Structure formats: C-alpha cells, structure tokens
Amino acid sequence: VQPSLGKESAAMKFERQHMDSTVATSSSPTYCNQMMKRRNMTQGQCKPVNTFVHESLADVHAVCSQENVKCKNGKSNCYKSHSALHITDCRLKGNAKYPNCDYQTSQHQKHIIVACEGNPFVPVHFDATV
C-alpha cells in the first residue's frame, strides 16, 4: 500500500520520483512513459524533466556524505556522488500535451547532485547531473 501523496515526506517523495534500483538500465524506449505514470508524475500535468537513478538506495543515501557542493538555488546542502551512477533522464517531448505525457528516454552514467537534510541525513531533492 502506497501512502497518500499528501502525507509523503520529502525523503519518500525523493524515492518515489528518483529511485529505481530494480533495473540496472532502462533499455526500453517506453521506460519513461511507464515510470512517470506509475510514480504519479503525470497527474494534473506532465512533469517536464525527471531523472531516475538505477543504484541501491544505500548507495544514493551515501552521496549525502560525499562531496559538499552548492545547490542550483544557492543553498549549501547539496552533495555530489564520488562516482558516475547509472541514470535515466526523462524529458517531455516538445509536442506532448497533458494528459498525453510522452517522454524521451535516455540513459547515462553521470555523477548526481542531491540535496540532503534531516536525521537520518538523506536525499530530499534531485539537483543535477554532471
């Protein structure tokens, strides 16, 4: 049973929107269309861009103790992964309109930058890939 989105913590939202440790890579071109829908990012509108990380939750949590960097918004609670991780970028295609959210799926190996907070200190926001 998934918790209602209203009671979702920032850490739980991060997991829902960005974690997919079940697959090492997303070879299917329809991966983003399926996952964006399954993870509730196409309700009411199409989320324009989203990144899924194909690593264990423990490995992504560990980024919070790696290199401290500035976030895009100027805050100082972002952390960059030491190594490149398997990720999938989902980008809304230019002509796609809600409710027909149609995404381009692209796979990469990149360093991720996440914002971390709380106790335990865990990712709550996906900031960037480099």
Swiss-Prot record:
Top-level taxon in the UniProt lineage: Eukaryota
Catalyzed reactions: an [RNA] containing cytidine + H2O = an [RNA]-3'-cytidine-3'-phosphate + a 5'-hydroxy-ribonucleotide-3'-[RNA]; an [RNA] containing uridine + H2O = an [RNA]-3'-uridine-3'-phosphate + a 5'-hydroxy-ribonucleotide-3'-[RNA]
Binding-site list for substrate: K13, R16, K47, P48, V49, N50, T51, K72, R91
Tissue: Pancreas.
Disulfide bonds: C32-C90, C46-C101, C64-C116, C71-C78
Cellular compartments annotated: Secreted
Record GO terms (molecular function): lyase activity; nucleic acid binding; ribonuclease A activity
Principal localisation: secreted
A cellular-component GO term for this protein: extracellular region
Catalytic machinery residues: H18, H125
Example GO BP: defense response to Gram-positive bacterium
Pfam (any one): RnaseA
Keyword annotations: Disulfide bond, Endonuclease, Glycoprotein, Hydrolase, Lyase, Nuclease, Secreted, Signal
Similarity remark: Belongs to the pancreatic ribonuclease family.
Summary of subunit composition and partner proteins: Monomer. Interacts with and forms tight 1:1 complexes with RNH1. Dimerization of two such complexes may occur. Interaction with RNH1 inhibits this protein.
The protein's role, per its UniProt record: Endonuclease that catalyzes the cleavage of RNA on the 3' side of pyrimidine nucleotides. Acts on single-stranded and double-stranded RNA.
Name of the protein in question: Ribonuclease pancreatic
Gene it is expressed from: RNASE1
